[in-house]
Each structure stands twice: as structure tokens, then as C-alpha cells.
Regions:
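Tandem CBS (Cystathionine beta-synthase) repeat/Bateman regulatory domains
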Residues: 1-169
Length: 169
């Protein structure tokens, strides 16, 4: 996994903060990684999603465990006519392990979201908290002025900041 794993550094501070002050280290995968490598990274790092970066660390996608699970759980469908009315029947005779093995060698960009919402270090965390809440995201990649990944901001990062503000810890 060493060739397809990227890591950037982040910091954490309390007070009236911007994203840059509370962002955390980001794990990412390269755009040319396969889903087997991505799944391994998700499990080994204990994360549920990863920004996908190009060779210059620009964010080009975002992949989550949910994207992979949807692909594994996808059902094949066929239409059947019953008395003149179309009825959709679901069938899936392919075992789960076979589906997972078939996904293993597919490119991450086949499942990754390509329109990625990102934060910048200068943004106030209140604005990003609102965005995370509204979009129901768990985290956002943090990018520099050139679109390169420099960290992530998570809901838990914001909650730690709020806790520190409330309790002075």
C-alpha cells in the first residue's frame, strides 16, 4: 500500500479557530489505486472515507466505505410483464464474496465522488460546521490555494473544539 497511501499533517488548537487550527492529519489514496488497496487502507487506518488525490496531491475524488458497500450490495434487475403491467423483479444469485473479489481490481475512480466539497484553512469553523451538518458529511478535505490536500476537518474535531470552549479544557 505504500505507493498509494498519502498522509498530510494537521494541528489542533482551542480558541476562536479557523479550519487550519483544528484540521487533522489526512490519509488519502491515489487516483490510480484499486479498490482492494483502498479497502485495506480504510480498514487498517480505521477511517470510513478517503480523499482521492492525483500525483500532485490535488483532490480529484472522495471514496467512502458506503460507496464500496453500495457496489457490493447492488442488485441485478430485470423487468417481467405480468398481465400487461410491468413488474420489476430483483434477483441476485451472485455470492457476496464473489462480488467483493470482482471489485478488488477496479479503479477507485469508478466509485469515487468526483465533485468534492472541500474546506480551506482560512474558513471559520462555524461555517464548516454548518456545511457538515447540512450535507450530513462526517469530514471534509482541507486544501491549499492550489487544491492540494493538507488535512481534513472532521465533525469530531469541531466537537473537541466546542468542548474546549465550553469547559476550558
Amino acid at each position: 500500500m505504500a505507493g498509494n497511501e498519502e498522509r498530510s499533517k494537521g494541528t489542533f488548537a482551542t480558541g476562536d479557530a479557523t479550519v487550519g487550527e483544528i484540521m487533522e492529519e489526512a490519509y488519502s489514496c491515489r487516483f490510480d489505486a484499486n479498490l482492494g488497496e483502498v479497502t485495506r487502507l480504510l480498514v487498517e487506518r480505521g477511517v470510513s472515507s478517503l480523499p482521492v488525490v492525483d500525483g500532485e496531491r490535488r483532490v480529484v475524488g472522495f471514496i467512502s466505505d458506503g460507496d464500496i458497500m453500495r457496489a457490493i450490495a447492488a442488485h441485478k434487475t430485470r423487468s417481467v410483464f405480468n398481465g400487461g403491467e410491468a413488474t420489476m423483479l430483483y434477483f441476485d444469485d451472485e455470492p457476496l464474496d464473489r462480488k467483493a473479489r470482482e471489485l478488488k481490481h477496479r479503479n477507485v475512480m469508478e466509485l469515487a465522488t468526483r465533485k468534492v466539497v472541500c474546506a480551506t484553512p482560512e474558513q471559520p469553523i462555524g461555517r464548516v460546521a454548518g456545511l457538515l451538518s447540512k450535507k450530513r458529511f462526517k469530514k471534509l478535505p482541507v486544501i491549499d490555494g492550489d487544491g492540494r490536500l493538507i488535512g481534513v476537518v472532521r465533525r469530531t474535531s469541531i466537537m473537541r473544539h466546542v468542548f474546549a470552549l465550553l469547559f476550558g479544557e
